[in-house]
Amino acid sequence: MLEFSSEVSLLDSVKNILLEYGLRFQEPQIEKVDKYIEELLGVPYNLTAHRDLDSAVHKNVVEILLPLKEELKGTLLDVGSGNGVPGLILAIFFSKLKVVLLDSREKSVNFLRGVIEKLDLENVSVVKERAENFSKERREEFDYVTARAVARLNVLVEICTPALKTGGKLLFYKGPSYIEELKEAQRAMKELKVELEKVREYSLKTGERRALLILRKYESSPEKYPRRVGVPFKRPLL
């Protein structure tokens, strides 16, 4: 049986969860997260189950911020952004970032544009395009490229790295099976000229284990990558 309550505001609930993890924030940031979570859940907080709220904040905010130990600034591309995670959350908490949310699905793009307008985010834009096309057209443009729950690591390396500047970093959010993905991504990493810089493992108080994989691009990727639309997914580099 789910419990409902109107006694605690969404704003206070988000604050309390972030404080449990020792995450720092400013009031305007929490206000934007407040609006974002409400848009994500699709209903006012007083009609939302505690369980839904707790899950949304952990999955879409805490999971993104917890492993980051440094300030992010410059340009960031979020590939397969979907509901805006991680790119939208990073844009809220790192004001010096200029973020591009990339997705090929009309529904996702419309949702993201609506949220950006409601949150009045000036450092975020949305592009409707396939990652393979975008990375080929916008080579060496971004300081960071990030993704979560889009594809396995070898596919991500191919479709994301060309858009990354040499010396830039890939930030990939993964689950506990990342070690297996790293093993199968060795060819892709070699071909696309990236190396593993570090892995930050962490756990949520809800029980989930997560890892942030940070890869650095040490040389320009060959012009032949990424391959045409769909090929990296159908025939990944192994």
UniProtKB/Swiss-Prot annotation:
Signal peptide: none annotated. Its main location: cytoplasm. SUPFAM superfamilies: S-adenosyl-L-methionine-dependent methyltransferases (SSF53335). GO terms for molecular function: rRNA (guanine-N7-)-methyltransferase activity. Keywords: Cytoplasm, Methyltransferase, rRNA processing, S-adenosyl-L-methionine, Transferase. Its EC number is 2.1.1.-. Belongs to the methyltransferase superfamily. RNA methyltransferase RsmG family. It holds the Pfam family GidB. GO terms for cellular component: cytosol. It comes from Thermotoga maritima (strain ATCC 43589 / DSM 3109 / JCM 10099 / NBRC 100826 / MSB8). S-adenosyl-L-methionine binds at G80, A131, E132, R148. It is an enzyme of class 2 (transferase). HAMAP family: 16SrRNA_methyltr_G. Gene3D superfamilies: Vaccinia Virus protein VP39. It is found in: Cytoplasm. Specifically methylates the N7 position of a guanine in 16S rRNA. This is Ribosomal RNA small subunit methyltransferase G.
